[in-house]
Amino acid sequence: MPKFRILIVDDSVIVRRIINNILSESDWIEVVGVAPSGQIALAKIPQVNPDLIILDVEMPEIDGLETLKRIRQTYKQLPVIMFSAITQRGAIATLDALTLGANDYITKPANMGSKEKAIEYIRKQLIPKIQVFCHRKVSLTKHCLAPSMTSFQRKTSTQLLTLKLEIVAIGVSTGGPQALYQLLHKFPASFRVPIVIVQHMPPVFTTRLAERLSSQCKIPVHEAKDRDVIKSGEAWIAPGNYHIILVREGKQVRIQTIQTPPENSCRPAVDVLFRSVAKLYQGAVLGVVLTGMGQDGLHGCTSIREMGGQVLVQDQASSVIWGMPGMVANAGLADQILPLNKLAEEIIRRIG
């Protein structure tokens, strides 16, 4: 089987060397080129024919965003992973890059001076993401059948479509910012129930994402804070590095931010939120799993279904990565599997 070909683009020689060394440890990866600038990268792409590009966000002359724009003019489907700093500017630039067509991103370690820690930090983020795009390339020629509805699903769906839903809980990862925009901007200001969201992102990034979505949508979107009271027609996104759960105090439902251990290597984790809403709202929950890598949300959807709630998942064709929604669908937990552009309409229909 041919090796997976990668082009590294970063103005730092140290970073290029670290990434090159990490990738060279894997016998299924071939680093076919390195480039210190966007200009050189654009010239190299047709020469080395990469399967994936790792692209630094901040570079002199032509920065990562401009380089990405030019890549997308010619190479619509070539996967690009952005390499970004965990700063306000880095978060904004990364969200811009995802809007412009970047497939995913990784964040730079806070201290590049500690070489061993920096290497391990980058390795843990980067290799799993590359594996996903490698597997995706291999599977593109395979015909995938949508999982069929199980008897468990048919029974539950029929019983509960008449139950009044009281909350929407959304879990999403890779491809999430664009998916959330495409979903949330279709909800009217009069949306009847609260929305709580887990998007796998680090601190600062979740703050900027909430601000951006709130400016683009008819409903307010907040980064969740401890003891926030949730309200109908508003959305809350879990802050980076914190799980969120919901607790009832009298007639109010509040958010709790907690730092219990990561689940599925994630904090915030979809499973933590979904278990919480299933326990609190029982059958009055609509869980929605959008594009994302891994299986976070699978156990949470099991909890939602066991308590009598409903689950929708994004389909494979419209997902950047059909990991999280695919796991839920293949486990027979989804009431419906829908393209992203049909999900908002179905959510509104079910909420009533």
Curated annotation (Swiss-Prot):
GO BP, sorted A to Z: chemotaxis
Catalytic machinery residues: 173, 200, 296
InterPro entries, A to Z: CheB-like, CheB_C, CheY-like_superfamily, Sig_transdc_resp-reg_Me-estase, Sig_transdc_resp-reg_receiver
Gene Ontology CC terms: cytoplasm
Keyword Signal: no
Primary location class: cytoplasm
Alphabetical list of Gene3D superfamilies matching this protein: 3.40.50.2300, Methylesterase CheB, C-terminal domain
Subcellular localization(s) per the UniProt record: Cytoplasm
Transmembrane intervals: none
Catalytic reaction(s) noted: [protein]-L-glutamate 5-O-methyl ester + H2O = L-glutamyl-[protein] + methanol + H(+); L-glutaminyl-[protein] + H2O = L-glutamyl-[protein] + NH4(+)
Function statement: Involved in chemotaxis. Part of a chemotaxis signal transduction system that modulates chemotaxis in response to various stimuli. Catalyzes the demethylation of specific methylglutamate residues introduced into the chemoreceptors (methyl-accepting chemotaxis proteins or MCP) by CheR. Also mediates the irreversible deamidation of specific glutamine residues to glutamic acid.
Domain notes for this protein: Contains a C-terminal catalytic domain, and an N-terminal region which modulates catalytic activity.
Protein name: Protein-glutamate methylesterase/protein-glutamine glutaminase
Protein species of origin: Trichodesmium erythraeum (strain IMS101)
Taxonomic classification: Bacteria, Bacillati, Cyanobacteriota, Cyanophyceae, Oscillatoriophycideae
Gene, per the UniProt record: cheB
